[in-house]
Amino acid sequence: VKIGGRVISEYSRSYFIADIAANDDGDINRAYHLIELAKEAGADAAKFQNFKAKTIVSKNGFESLGSQLSHQSSWKKSVFDTYQDASLPDEWSERLKRKCDEVGIEYMTSPYDFDSVDHADQYVNAYKIGSGDITWIEILEYIARKKKPVLLATGAANLEDVKRAIQTLRKYNDQVILMQCNTNYTASELNFSYINLNVLKTYQKLYPECILGLSDHTFGHTTVLGAYMLGARVFEKHFTDDNDREGPDHKFSMNPLTWK
């Protein structure tokens, strides 16, 4: 699989994605700074997200969950308001892409609706599909038809979900990177008990031609080392400059020191 100028294979050096996501805290200058830090730390790509709060979360649905909320229960704002704050203005994309080109790092994003896919297409060489969309067949087809490499996260999916998603993507596109993922964002040490890296063995047997990867939300790099030994070559970790900042992703993110 080729992303930009990098060919990724079982025998190539690993490909590292610094997921800046919401860690810019709504400030494009912080985003620029994090791009620079990610490059200095050795990341191959800096990743963002394109979504609108009203199309990615149900305000009423999350409010009705109350105490059943998982990692969102620790957020100081409501789920809807947090996503509203984390959504990037469309006009940022060109500027972020330009900054990535300037420092020599791949610009990447996860689009979460059809309009966002079309918006991102002019800026990206590959698409990342988040775990939450693995059963949304229409968006999988839409992205696959763009004929660019696809990184598919499989958190919270069962094996039938994964098989269906791979079958859907491959109808139009054989450039698929299959990524194990844990979807708990609490930064709790208990998350290491649910990372299930052994599923990479299953993926390798089912799809020996696929590049494997890990989209990870645990802190540190223990899971990266384990996944590498099981065949993963693409790694995505959240990235920040300060783990003590207020926000949903800072606590479990890598920083420039731990990334190196």
Feature map (PLM): residue ranges:
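Catalytic cores and adjacent flexible loops of soluble metabolic enzymes
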Residues: 1-260
